[in-house]
Design a protein with these regions (language model features):
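Short boundary/loop segments of OB/S1/cold-shock single-stranded nucleic-acid-binding domains
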Residues: 8-35, 78-91, 117-140, 178-183
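Acidic/polar N-terminal loop/beta-strand segments that form early-domain functional surfaces
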Residues: 37-39, 51-54, 62-63
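Surface-exposed interaction/gating patches
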Residues: 132-176, 181-185
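Acidic-enriched and Gly/Ser
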Residues: 47, 58-104, 110-117, 181-184
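Short aromatic-glycine-enriched beta-strand elements
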Residues: 43-51, 109-111, 154-158
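Short, small-residue-biased leader/transition segments that mark boundaries at the very start
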Residues: 2-7
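A short macromolecule-binding patch
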Residues: 56-65, 122-123, 164-176
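Structural detector for short beta-strands of small beta-barrel domains
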Residues: 26-47, 94-105, 137-153, 185
Length: 185
């Protein structure tokens, strides 16, 4: 029908506009934000995070997700670490994730990105560089906004301008919190 043709064309136009945004972000190395939608294993056995950016699938290799769990062990310790990493990623599902586009394929409209690069850039801007007055933007005692990226019963994981940290449930409020899920999600 004519109506469905119009609808299809509008959707294609919208996709073209969003693809143009992605392409520009790739060219300018601009930080963009999407929602963590899943964890998948590719045919080559590599695990990747899948982020949704306005309807486009963005693939982020696990090592570019910056889930920092310390040193890189081997054997059983490595298996345990991978399990912990996947659990953390599982708790992060639905979280807003900043990333920098590292590669695009215009034919297939596929996108590969790095969260790590975005996090390091934000650290540089907010913790290491100074503003016009020569002041750091983030410093001890300053109240800043944090992005909740994962919630478990006893702990909330937040990102503060490129730095991830955990806050224990008992430190989140003056009153008793039995389960952090009830207050933070």
């Amino acid at each position: 029908s004519a109506a469905s043709d119009v609808y299809r064309r509008q959707a294609e136009d919208r996709d073209d506009v969003i693809w143009h945004e992605i392409h520009n972000a790739y060219r300018t190395r601009k930080i963009i934000t999407g929602k963590l939608g899943g964890i998948e294993q590719l045919d080559n056995r590599k695990t990747v995070a899948v982020v949704d950016y306005k309807g486009f699938r963005v693939i982020i290799p696990i090592k570019e997700m910056m889930i920092n769990l310390g040193r890189s062990p081997s054997g059983q310790e490595y298996a345990d670490l991978m399990l912990r990493q996947n659990k953390i990623l599982g708790n992060m599902l639905g979280a807003d994730i900043d990333f920098i586009v590292r590669g695009i394929d215009s034919k297939t409209r596929s996108v590969v990105a790095s969260r790590k690069e975005a996090m390091l850039r934000k650290r540089q801007i907010f913790y290491l560089d100074t503003d016009a007055a020569g002041m750091y933007r983030v410093y001890e005692g300053r109240i800043v906004q944090a992005r909740v990226i994962a919630v478990a019963e006893k702990v909330v994981r937040v990102e503060v301008f490129g730095v991830e940290t955990s806050i224990l449930a008992r430190d989140l409020a003056w009153d008793w919190i039995g389960d952090a899920h009830e207050r933070f999600s």
